Amino acid sequence: MLGSLRKEKPQFIGSMTALITPFENGILDVNSFKKIVNHQIENGTDGLIPVGTTGESPTLSHDEHQKVVEVCIQESSGRVPIIAGAGSNSTKEASKLASHAGKAGADAVLVVTPYYNKPTQSGLYSHFMSVADAAKIPLIVYDIPGRSIVPVHDSTLVKLCENHELISGIKDATADISRPPRLLRLIGRGFSQLSGEDATALPYLAAGGHGCISVSSNIAPKLLAEMHDAWNNSNYNKAFENHLKLINLHDAMFCESSPGPVKFAAERLGLCKSEARLPIVEIEATSKSRIIRALKECNLI
């Protein structure tokens, strides 16, 4: 039996991209970012996520963070939903970023579990409730214990949905494909369940998920959009064909600390320079060779 907390259709579905943030000589490269936004939309991406982990949000100033969100919203012109990153391990800071995103016209905010300070489940609940109050737009909970240490328990998600109508979904980077059916039963079909792991995107769909917030789609937006479209149209062979084609690319995107690999790939495709901010550094020659092989396998170069 499906849960009754979220009965309507999920608001956010399909192939979504956790956008990189391009730099040139240490400065935001706004023109390249605009090009990336249009490249994504023109190749079928269903939603864009600026200033998340892949967008190097921890090393952006608040002014830069807000600028990237504003440019993404303006350049996309309502063609696809914008889910703005608003994560911080400070509830006050996350609330400020979320409030700005809402006022700027974002469709939702993506809020990561607070990292480093290891809050209890009660602390997580209070954090997300406070940020949702500040955002005044839908909030996607970003559960990534590999980076944040503390996981968001299913019971905490249920409690959030019971007590705040703007808690609208999850970006699940746990790679636990048993979770979508659990949350369908506990919360309902209207709670957007988005994989945060490229390699498990298709299994996540098969388990009842609704889409993926992807790193690889910075590089292969069309292949990933086609995979999701094929799945949604019951063309499972085509979906699996694209999934197999992309596996080595998914692996290559994390051969070193992200977003180093994806930025190198973006430079190879002429999207922007590979420059990242410290402590992310230029990737090793062996990693570059591995990425080039993966790009060739996907017929991207």
How should each PLM-predicted stretch be described?
Residues 33, 65, 69, 94, ...:
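A general structural signal for well-ordered alpha-helical segments in protein cores
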Residues 3-5, 11-22, 39, 43-45, ...:
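C-terminal alpha-helical cap/extension of soluble enzyme domains
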Residues 60-63, 96, 121-124, 152-154, ...:
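Short secondary-structure transition/capping segments
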Residues 74-80, 104-105, 135-137, 162-166, ...:
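Short helix-capping segments at alpha-helix termini
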Residues 37, 69, 128, 164, ...:
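Short amphipathic alpha-helical/adjacent loop interface patches that line ligand
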Residues 2-17, 21-24, 28-149, 159:
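Active-site beta->alpha loop and helix N-cap motifs at the rims of alpha/beta catalytic domains
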Residues 26, 58, 87, 190-191, ...:
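A generic secondary-structure micro-motif detector
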Residues 133, 147-254:
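Catalytic alpha/beta core domains of metabolic enzymes, predominantly
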